[in-house]
A protein has these predicted regions:
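HIT superfamily nucleotide-processing domains
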Residues: 1-108
């Protein structure tokens, strides 16, 4: 989708502080963090929300859930973290590109 904010980040048209990237996923720091560590993990392919996920997206969603903890640990969240997905306008979703919020406070 050409006008999607997160698609523009994936294409490098908008800068972001990237904390992880592979062929299918991109993670970057949230611009309005709600915790000392707050990053978003997104699929590079545009998926609007959990409401539009289909069977072909299942492996990618599983990869997102499996990848998030390793990124969190690299950012100092070995003791734990929160994950959340806002889905649809009524669920608080503001950017309509599927994204997983990962938040926490590093423990010493």
């Amino acid at each position: 989708m050409t006008d999607c904010l997160f698609c523009k980040i994936v294409r490098g048209e908008i800068p972001a502080k990237v904390v992880y990237e592979d062929d299918e996923l991109l993670a970057f720091n949230d611009i309005r963090p709600h915790a000392p560590v707050h990053f978003l993990l997104i699929p590079k392919r545009h998926i609007e929300s959990l409401l539009t996920v289909n069977e072909t997206d299942q492996a990618l969603l599983g990869k997102m859930l499996a990848t998030a903890p390793s990124i969190a640990k690299q950012l100092g969240l070995q003791a734990g973290f929160k994950m959340g997905v806002n889905t649809g306008a009524a669920g608080g979703q503001e950017v309509f590109h599927l994204h997983l919020h990962v938040l926490g406070t590093p423990q010493e």
